[in-house]
Amino acid sequence: MADDGSASNRRDPIKSSVGNVAGQRRRKQAVTVAKERRELLVRAKRLCRVGTNGDVEDALVENEMMVDEEQPILEAQASKSVEELKSAVQYQGKGAMQKRVTALRELRRLLSKSEFPPVEAALRAGAIPLLVQCLSFGSPDEQLLESAWCLTNIAAGKPEETKALLPALPLLIAHLGEKSSAPVAEQCAWAIGNVAGEGEDLRNVLLSQGALPPLARMIFPDKGSTVRTAAWALSNLIKGPESKAAAQLVKIDGILDAILRHLKKTDEETATEIAWIIVYLSALSDIATSMLLKGGILQLLIDRLATSSSLQLLIPVLRSLGNFVAVDPKAVLTILIREQNTEESIIGVLAKCLRSEHRVLKKEAAWVLSNIAAGSIEHKRMIHSTEVMPLLLRILSTSPFDIRKEVAYVLGNLCVESAEGDRKPRIIQEHLVSIVSGGCLRGFIELVRSPDIEAARLGLQFIELVLRGMPNGEGPKLVEGEDGIDAMERFQFHENEELRVMANSLVDKYFGEDYGIDE
């Protein structure tokens, strides 16, 4: 189900019940995460410089050959290399196979050795039909591997260069099968992963040609490199915005067991690739989400958070955890109760991430906590009773804006019970007093002053809680003491009607003509 763009990027803070817009939020997150993922980890496409056959000697030669050369020289060499490949393909005499492999290897080296490989020149010279011909069934493994490697690096190029692989896709998919050698299958999976990383249209072509089942079966064995490559390609193939591929993947017998096994037992690099599959499954497939929860996914994710320091792994693990929290808060509550107040508890591992120096990690951890804090009164009490509270209050006053905003969602949600519709939420006064006493009000008023509409709304909502909920009517004085009146008055003629009405109503109600008259 593609997001229509109208859904909130997270459940509406303070006013909504847990899960109210969780499904929409998870689907939208799956659409946007691909861009973030490329920016943070440069993962959508990968140039292959060292092959999948484990040939160390070849890798060393490759490294020696990686010298900076003028682009025109590289392009001329690429054109010449394609012509030599064309001659080798046509040659039928003695040593024909070795002649083809030598020509393929030379083209592959040219497509691997530069930061900007001469892909366009190779395509103009007619490389694709020749590479497709070299992928034909019955060809020696060495020829298949070199051809798939060339196609992998072509697919890592510009969009139009990636699309040039369309004629090769059926054979690349066919070589994913069990009859292929592991290096050949892995190299073909790599090429397919690059194609899938280009965009939705090419993903749909791959799905229609049957790429998903053989790719999924490649993660069943415990073969590290093959599993990593196949899992990365799978995550590119299912990442949305449509849920069709995720729904198809979860129907493959044994796939969820394999995902859980690898997340639990494999090295961090493999677990990272598996975790990105979980991100998209938990965002796009309710069936997969339910089945993974039954398989104990939450505890596995928490265990990875507790034991890993790898940013590349922790980001998808946190993203997955937040998705599961949004869809099944009861499962999270069970774990909260069982492991409360320990470093290995869900709150403990999220606190660990909040203490990290990595900005993205802090933001992701705060987002997960905001999902938990938007749950039941039990969820809120469990968070409020832990060591994470002083940490959240400190972050609200010291961190960059985007992290402060995420933390503000946590603190705001801790102060109210979940409410349905337009009804004002009931304030949890004990939490509100504690959080305000911790010095958070200034941080929320700073959000009101920000140009970010979402943050300003959140700040105004919290001010309303303070004005309405602090005991002995002390809310207005507290807000005034932090220059909250001035912050709200900036909305007197604001173009956003919702914020204008909200701010003006609060000023009129709590700071009208009679304000301060009894002092």
Curated annotation (Swiss-Prot):
InterPro entries cross-referenced by the UniProt entry: ARM-like, ARM-type_fold, Armadillo, Importin_alpha
Signal peptide residues on this chain, from the entry's feature table: none
Assembly and interaction partners: Forms a complex with importin subunit beta-1.
Localization per record: Nucleus envelope
Region of interest: Disordered: 1-29
PANTHER family named among the record's database cross-references: IMPORTIN ALPHA
GO cellular component: cytoplasm; nuclear envelope
An annotated GO BP: protein import into nucleus
Pfam families, per database record: Arm
Function according to Swiss-Prot or TrEMBL: Binds to conventional NLS motifs and mediates nuclear protein import across the nuclear envelope. Acts as a cellular receptor for the nuclear import of the virD2 protein of Agrobacterium, but is not essential for Agrobacterium-mediated root transformation.
Parts forming coiled coils: none
Family according to the record: Belongs to the importin alpha family.
SUPFAM superfamilies (alphabetical): ARM repeat
Protein name (database record): Importin subunit alpha-9
Tagged with keyword Plastid: no
Record keywords: Nucleus, Protein transport, Repeat, Transport
Gene Ontology molecular function: nuclear import signal receptor activity
Repeat listed as a keyword: yes
ARM repeats (start-end): 116-156, 158-197, 200-239, 244-283, 286-326, 335-374, 377-416, 429-468
